[in-house]
């Protein structure tokens, strides 16, 4: 079992500011500044302890505000498309979806927008930390986890954006994003941490290939997402 423990060491004589660290990380993941014009499709296989295998195809065109999610779970397949202000849903090839199916599979436009934001955020890191409403603690932290030292940024958000507290862990040599964790209430040690392994380049962006999820509270393994193109 992976044990997520470590020591937070504020760097009083900082080698670089939090802003400089983020710049270095973005330079690593998006060396040619392609993210704002990102246009590509990729696949995510989600393996969960308590749920059946879920395979998703995600298409993003950030410049055109286009998002498409096609999901396969067992014998069922559904799609959600957001094209600017328009939303379209289908289930097993039909757009005529019963209320029962909508409720069972949580198939609605609000959910589609949530998934758009979810995939754009997680696969757009660390570039998404430049978004409006993001509050980056100016103090760079050094943290030792499982014998490895990381540079760490603490991030919170304006109330209208989000209420969670996030920590992002960067490789001390390459500045690659290696793990992150979030808390709903840090005093309760709730929330989850995510370990990133390997990389895959999608449309010029270095994205994590494997993401493994664990509870902060007891290191319980929750599942794994595997990226492919």
Regions inferred by a protein language model and the residue ranges of each:
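Flexible, processing/modification-adjacent segments and terminal tails
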Residues: 14-20, 89-164, 187-190
């Amino acid at each position: 079992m992976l044990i997520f423990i470590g020591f937070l060491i504020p760097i009083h004589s900082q080698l670089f500011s939090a802003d400089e660290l983020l710049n270095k990380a973005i330079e690593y993941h998006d060396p040619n500044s392609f993210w704002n014009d990102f246009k590509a499709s990729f696949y995510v296989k989600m393996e969960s302890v308590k749920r059946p295998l879920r395979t998703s195809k995600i298409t993003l065109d950030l410049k055109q505000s286009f998002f498409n999610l096609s999901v396969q779970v067992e014998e069922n397949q559904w799609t959600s498309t957001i094209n600017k202000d328009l939303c379209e849903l289908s289930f097993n090839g039909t757009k005529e979806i019963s209320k029962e199916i909508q409720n069972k599979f949580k198939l609605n436009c609000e959910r589609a927008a949530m998934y758009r934001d979810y995939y754009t955020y997680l696969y757009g890191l660390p570039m998404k930390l430049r978004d409006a409403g993001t509050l980056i603690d100016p103090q760079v932290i050094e943290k030792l986890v499982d014998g490895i030292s990381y540079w760490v940024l603490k991030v919170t958000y304006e109330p209208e954006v989000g209420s969670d507290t996030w920590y992002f862990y960067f490789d001390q040599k390459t500045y690659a994003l290696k793990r992150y964790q979030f808390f709903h209430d840090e005093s309760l040690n709730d929330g989850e941490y995510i370990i990133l392994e390997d990389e895959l380049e999608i449309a010029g962006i270095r994205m994590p290939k494997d993401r493994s999820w664990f509870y902060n509270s007891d290191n319980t393994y929750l599942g794994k997402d595997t990226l492919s193109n």
